[in-house]
Amino acid sequence: MAGLALLPDIWLWHLGVSGWPLALAILWWVPSLLLLLAEVGLQMGFFHKLSVRILFTTILFSVMPKVVFILFDFMMPWFFALLPALALMGWFAFGFIEGWKRLEIRYVTYESPDLPPYFDGYRLLHFTDFHLGSFPKDSDFVQKVVDAANNEEPDMMLFTGDLVNNDAREVEPYLETLKQLHAQDGIFSVWGNHDYCEYGNNHTIAGLRNNWKLLYNYQCQLGWHQLMNDHFTVSHGMASIDIIGVENAGQPPFSNRSKLPKAMKGLGKDGFRILLTHDPHHWRREVWDRPIQLTLAGHTHAGQLQIGKWTPARMAFKEWGGVYRKGSQMLNVSSGIGGSFPFRLGAWPEMTVITLKRTLK
C-alpha cells in the first residue's frame, strides 16, 4: 500500500516540488515517511493502534488530496486544481471531528411464516463494533448510544462483536454507562476479531488469557449473555425463538473460532432462529445451507467511508452493509458504532431496529 501511496508524491516531485527550497522539499516527504513507517509497524506488529491511525490519516489527508489535485491539474491551472483537493481535506476533517458522532438508527422489517404468533411485532436492536478504545476519554458519545438504544424500547438487544480494540480494560471507563442498556428479554453478545486482543507482537499467552478473562467478566457485569458457540432459547409460554451465537468466524488473516454445528447442537428441525456472527463472510460460507432464518453481523464498518454506493468495504466484502436475502433467509450487516480510529464519513455510525413479522405459509 505504501508503495502505491508514494506515486502521487513522485509525480508531483517531478512536476515541480523538486525545485522548492530544501526545508519545504524535506517537509513534503514527511507524510509519506510516516505512512511507510506505519505500514512497517503494522506488518511487524509494533504500535498497532498508533500505526493504524497514522496510516489512515496520511491516506485521507495526504495521498487522496494529491491524487485529486493531479487529476484536476490535467484539466485546469494548478491554483484551480488546488481547490477540490483542499475541499476534500475539509470534508475528511468533518469525518474526524463530527462524523464519528453522527449516530443513525436504521429500521428493517423481517417477515417469516416460521415466526411464532407471540413474536409477531417483536423488536430487536442490533448493535455492533463499539471499539471502545477509540473514543476520547471525555467523550459522551457512548452515553448517547446507550440513550438512543434504550429509547427504542426493543424487546431484545443483540451485539455482534468488537467491544474493544486490543485491550479488555478499554471497557472500564464505560462500564457504568453500558450497564444502563436494557431490554425486556435481555442482551446477547458474541465476540469479534478485536475482542481476542491479539493485535501486535507484545502478547504472552498468559497476557492473552488474562485479557479474555477480563473481557468475559466485564460482559458478565454488564448482564450480557455471551454465546460462545452456543445457543439460548427465549420462551414466552409455549412460543420460543432460538438465539445462536458463534465465536469469530473470520477469514485469513483473522482467526476462525466458530463452531456452528456445536452452537446448534440440541436444536430441533423446526423453529425460528437468529444467528449472531461477527464476520458477514460466514453467511455464504456456512449459513446458507442451514435452517437459520435471520443472521446478524458487523465487522465491515462499511469502510467508515461511503460516497453514494461506493465504499472501500466493497473490495473485501460481497455483503458489506445493510440487508441481503437468499430465499427466505436474511442477513443484516450493520456498519457499527465505532472503528479502529474515530472517523466516519457517509458510513455513519448506526444501530438497526429489526421488527419481526409473522406471515402465512
Regions found by a protein language model. Give the residues of each.
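Non-catalytic terminal accessory segments
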Residues: 1-103
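Short, structured coil/loop segments at alpha-helix boundaries
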Residues: 17-24, 28, 48-49, 76-80, ...
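N-terminal signal-anchor transmembrane helix
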Residues: 48-55, 75-152
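Generic structural motif
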Residues: 70, 113-115, 359
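Soluble catalytic domains of enzymes that build or remodel membrane lipids, polysaccharides, and related
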Residues: 118-361
